[in-house]
Amino acid sequence: MREYNIGISVIIPNYNGLELFPQTIPTIFEALAETKLENEIIIVDDCSTDDSVKYISENFPSIITIKNIKNSGFSKSVNIGVSHSSYQFVLILNSDVKLTKTFFTNQISHLSNPKVFGVMSKIIGWDNDKQQDGATYPILELFKIKTSTSYSYKHDDNQARFTTYLSGANMFIKKDIFYEIGEFDEIFSPYYSEDTELSIRAWRLGYLCIYEPKAICRHKISYTMKKSQKKKNVDIIYNRNKFILHELALTGISKLFWRLQLFIELIFRIITLNFRFIKSYILYIKMFGEINRSIHRFNTNSKKLKQNKSFTDVKNFKFNY
């Protein structure tokens, strides 16, 4: 496995995030300064129309800016950013997130464990301390993957814990493992479920995902999405990507029964004229070629690493780290 220089690269995929930059970017510099490590900030601009790039170049000239030729979505933008990064520790960060001063210093010790893929912090409100996200555990409910069930809300004792997934809003990972397990799958472009799938893939290939509540960031929920997308389009892509997630994460009898219940649900949605769900299903079916290529890539990596846990194995992890 290739070795990279020790330091921190912050990757920010951006679409029209200019309005929040004056509030977010200074907090990143402050948190990086606390680490005493070499660092860089890379913004991958996804064809913004709000002068984001101009603002960054004029006000933060040390930030590296990469401009996508066409709007490509979250997973591709992050992959581009990581490919241009210089350091082993990579923070994937939404443009609508503010960091606290000790954000990195409370997480970085976990990355010394060779089996840890990455860490995520506690996510609280932009203007309040209400928790938005934390450690989650996976559930198969009628063969549907549920990853939003949080046990950190009930056990918020400031203890680091295992978590099913690392949120794409603040995913602090190791670059060598990111490449070893295969980067973000761009099949999920433009958005949704790519962080969940990557995290489950890491678990299945023998790595660990950690939640560290002592590290905190503030998030303005779906700020960019609300500005750029219609709810109808968001719903269609959300459902399509949930279907793809199940195809990639499930195996054997679990996948067979999931497909059966999905077909039954499709019949009900047709009867009730739920056209958004139907459109999502059609898009999912059209992507079977890409889905199979993704499965093939996973199987190739699985053979190299000699690891191939099922989703059932993943959901049996112990909560305490």
Q: Where are each of the predicted segments found?
A:
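Glycine-rich, basic loop-to-helix element that forms the pyrophosphate-binding segment
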Residues: 68-85, 95
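A conserved acidic beta->alpha catalytic loop
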Residues: 27, 45-54, 70
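Short aromatic/hydrophobic "clamp" motif used to bind/position activated sugar donors
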Residues: 90
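A short, conserved alpha-helix in the catalytic core of glycosyltransferases
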Residues: 164-182, 187-216
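Conserved donor NDP-sugar-binding/catalytic core segment of glycosyltransferases
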Residues: 98-138
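Short, well-formed alpha-helical segments that are part of the catalytic scaffolds
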Residues: 17-32
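Short, flexible, basic/aromatic active-site loop/helix in glycosyltransferases
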Residues: 140-163
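Non-catalytic, C-terminal membrane-associated alpha-helical segments of glycosyltransferases
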Residues: 233, 237, 252-321
